[in-house]
């Protein structure tokens, strides 16, 4: 692998290898990469620019909005929408669908979480942007509506995330493997650093907020107890790694192997993570890397969405670990 392969060069190679991926799709991903550079610039200087802390409002989820959330949301809408490739967008921060600039010429749908893990911004923990891309169903950009956004995850044509941490990485898939790029600030480019990412079939870590233990159902509790039991034959006990930033926890488990668990609870019976712009894109990436993603009963990518901000339980990561989680959730163990 050439460490100096830029994201643009990689996309050109991808088109040659897979003719069904047209230049428009790679242009969409380039737009996302450009927007990520803008967000990254503010994330790394947030404490100096006075855009930390709360903005004094709540989003559609009822969550307090951080100033940087609003900044990231605006930057993504304007930077990605300016080229007229998207007819409609949906964001965690907006209750209704968004008609971006120049939407009249758009043929695609973008769903995104502008800054996942934003509650960690003030303490310098990794945060990220998650995105999902679909083709427009209605065919006519001026007629684009909520129905265009409510497509199954299996219909995604591209998905990815950007993690803003000790380094900045963009990880994406178009259904032809998973590839990661690290931002080199000396040249201002994303360079190919992780080609054809695959996740181990068995992991060694589990990521869950065990502070919610009393809210978990019996199946979830039994699964977590299973992971903590000592059994050299199955590589147990697993170690806990939980940051509280979905992008960061998922990224680590993707590379090292493990399972991320955000189950249904007594308080959140439908789960807490959002299906359309959190679970679906990460499930697409995970499956392309050889992993698995379910709600405990169904494949995430097969769920028929009913709402833009629909929530779901999520078990995602190494294939065998998720299969075992499903067995406990379904009462088979």
Curated annotation (Swiss-Prot):
Pathway: Carbohydrate biosynthesis; Calvin cycle. Keywords: Calvin cycle, Carbohydrate metabolism, Cytoplasm, Hydrolase, Magnesium, Metal-binding. It comes from the Bacteria. Substrate binds at residues 116-119, 209, 242, 272. Mg(2+) 1 binds at residues 92, 113, 115. It catalyses: beta-D-fructose 1,6-bisphosphate + H2O = beta-D-fructose 6-phosphate + phosphate. Binds 2 magnesium ions per subunit. PANTHER family: FRUCTOSE-1,6-BISPHOSPHATASE-RELATED, SEDOHEPTULOSE-1,7-BISPHOSPHATASE, CHLOROPLASTIC. Homotetramer. NCBIfam families: PRK09293.1-1, PRK09293.1-3. This is Fructose-1,6-bisphosphatase class 1. It comes from Chlorobaculum tepidum (strain ATCC 49652 / DSM 12025 / NBRC 103806 / TLS). The gene is fbp.
